[in-house]
């Protein structure tokens, strides 16, 4: 494989008008062959796109996209050079696909890395420096690791650097370059905003019965068992010691202690004989 020199990259850039990084990548993919690199750039739609990137884009569309369920919404402005292109199906499909891309990427906040404020980049850098896995490493090694991580992190915030949701082999930037080559006009994503339902609002926890009661002005009564359960507190060591055992009521007293275990036969009461009735023993013979 031929060495990719700065001179070779410059030569390809002057020939095609493509960006430096695109030229370097094309030479790497083609093994340093200039003709193959040029063909690779043409296939990616990069050659003509770079030449048109400086043109003014004052036309275009502001497109809205509402995701299924109505919980995520996107507004995006995509610019082109002429109104004729803006009204074409190719441009409309592109702006809709970009809006869907934004809806699918919750971390994306900026169009490109160059749009990220320096304060945000510096804050991300401080976060990376404070990670535990960098503790004890030499400063020069730590700086290299941080630079690599911060570059990756900033790309996560950039729309242009996201893998295209319908074709993960290309980025959103490459998708736009391919469309530029197809329609022959410069295209730029100017700005976008992403809405999420309820974002930033602290939600109050309510059950369905309480919500209905709040709307109708009625009071929700809990079941008696639930109220008693809610009042019962778990015993503590102090309360356990103070609890007295339950008092058992005294047993009913009986005449004889053995009455509980021994059953005596019932006593018979003698019947008095009526007066005037002589007994057999006292009867005299005449």
Swiss-Prot record:
Pfam families: EF_TS. Residues 253-269 have a biased composition (Low complexity). It is found in: Cytoplasm. Residues 82-85 are annotated as: Involved in Mg(2+) ion dislocation from EF-Tu. Residues 215-227 have a biased composition (Polar residues). GO terms for molecular function: translation elongation factor activity. InterPro entries: EF-Ts_dimer_sf, Transl_elong_EFTs/EF1B, Transl_elong_EFTs/EF1B_dimer, Transl_elong_Ts_CS, UBA-like_sf. One of its GO terms (cellular component) is cytoplasm. Residues 212-286 are annotated as: Disordered. Keywords: Cytoplasm, Elongation factor, Protein biosynthesis. Gene3D superfamilies: 1.10.286.20, DNA helicase RuvA subunit, C-terminal domain (1.10.8.10), Elongation factor Ts, dimerisation domain (3.30.479.20). Belongs to the EF-Ts family. Associates with the EF-Tu.GDP complex and induces the exchange of GDP to GTP. It remains bound to the aminoacyl-tRNA.EF-Tu.GTP complex up to the GTP hydrolysis stage on the ribosome. This is Elongation factor Ts. It comes from Gloeothece citriformis (strain PCC 7424). The lineage of its organism: Bacteria, Bacillati, Cyanobacteriota, Cyanophyceae, Oscillatoriophycideae.
């Amino acid at each position: 494989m031929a060495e990719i020199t700065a001179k070779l990259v410059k030569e390809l850039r002057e020939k095609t008008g493509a960006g430096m990084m695109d030229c370097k990548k094309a030479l790497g993919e083609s093994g340093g062959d200039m003709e193959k690199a040029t063909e690779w750039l043409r296939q990616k739609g990069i050659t003509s796109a770079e030449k048109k990137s400086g043109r003014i884009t004052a036309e275009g569309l502001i497109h809205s996209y509402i995701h299924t369920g109505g919980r995520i919404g996107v507004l995006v402005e995509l610019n082109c050079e002429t109104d004729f292109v803006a009204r074409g199906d190719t441009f409309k499909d592109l702006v809709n696909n970009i809006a869907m891309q934004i809806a699918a990427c919750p971390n994306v906040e900026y169009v490109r890395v160059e749009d990220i404020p320096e304060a945000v980049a510096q804050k991300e850098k401080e976060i990376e420096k404070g990670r535990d896995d960098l503790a004890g490493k030499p400063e020069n090694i730590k700086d290299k690791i941080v630079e690599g991580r911060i570059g990756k992190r900033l790309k996560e915030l950039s729309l242009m650097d996201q893998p295209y949701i319908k074709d993960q082999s290309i980025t959103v930037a490459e998708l736009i370059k391919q469309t530029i080559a197809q329609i022959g006009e410069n295209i730029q994503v100017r700005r976008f905003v992403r809405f999420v339902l309820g974002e930033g609002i602290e939600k109050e926890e309510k059950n369905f019965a309480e919500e209905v009661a709040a709307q109708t002005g009625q009071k929700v009564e809990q079941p008696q068992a639930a109220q008693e359960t809610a009042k019962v507190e778990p015993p503590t060591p102090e309360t356990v010691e103070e609890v007295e055992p339950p008092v058992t009521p005294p047993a009913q007293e009986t005449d004889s202690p053995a009455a509980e275990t021994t059953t005596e036969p019932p006593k018979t009461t003698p019947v008095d004989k009526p007066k005037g009735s002589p007994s057999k023993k006292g009867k005299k013979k005449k």
